[in-house]
Amino acid sequence: MTAFWGEVIGTMLLIIFGAGVCAGVNLKKSLSFQSGWIVVVFGWGLGVAMAAYAVGGISGAHLNPALTIALAFVGDFPWKEVPVYIAAQMIGAIIGAVIIYLHYLPHWKSTDDPAAKLGVFSTGPSIPHTFANVLSEVIGTFVLVLGILAIGANQFTEGLNPLIVGFLIVAIGISLGGTTGYAINPARDLGPRIAHAFLPIPGKGSSNWKYAWVPVVGPILGGSFGGVFYNAAFKGHITSSFWIVSVILVVVLLGLYVYTKSHSAKTLSNSKYI
């Protein structure tokens, strides 16, 4: 099997486990209906671990465009392979989402809430706030990439690394995931969101495209900074990439902060005349 198909299958498995647990929690008449956030984060964490066990020896089990880009910045992955991996991850994520749709086929009609249906496929903020939502994804993915690189630098019992990474996902979900649903992976959010848009889900409502850029841009920025920060802080390698990524991150976050603040002020001003 090629690395391309390894990423397709690995990401498909990740979404089957992750979106599957979200479906079980969100959709009515599921035996795990309303079982809670802890179930969700453990489902995603174990899903990452199982997918990594399945294809780690084939593709390295990136399963995440933000991680692929971060590894390229670190120098552990060739830039020419980045588009191939990202394409594979997107394909796998869409396939995984379609499989979950089919698996829970009779449950869609039993669930009235369009937001609950969308929540099976993609993330959304608990409080819509552009700057804070992007920052949450930046921080979560920064911690993810930093953690993965640190785990990779340590010696564990052979075969234990994927499980440790799975628990890293759980830890991030418990501590940081409550704000945006912690996408921390552009393919994990965008692929299933695309599937949600074209699948014939009864009463599904909007795919919330106005938010879709947040779990793409945030993780890419956070993951990239996590990679160059690890090289600088842990290895002492401060390259031009570190400064480029740092400047882009600061400029984007400052721009979003100013935009969000001005938009909030305008909304408040308009509300006075209602």
Curated annotation (Swiss-Prot):
Q: What GO CC terms are in its UniProt record? A: plasma membrane
Q: What's an example GO BP annotation here?
A: glycerol transmembrane transport
Q: How does it sit in the membrane?
A: Multi-pass membrane protein
Q: Where in the cell is it found?
A: Cell membrane
The reaction(s) this protein catalyses? glycerol(in) = glycerol(out)
Annotated keywords: Cell membrane, Membrane, Transmembrane, Transmembrane helix, Transport
Q: Which domain of life is it from?
A: Bacteria
Q: Could you say which protein family the record assigns here?
A: Belongs to the MIP/aquaporin (TC 1.A.8) family.
Which named protein is this? Glycerol uptake facilitator protein
Supply the source organism for this entry: Bacillus subtilis (strain 168)
> What's the name of its gene?
glpF
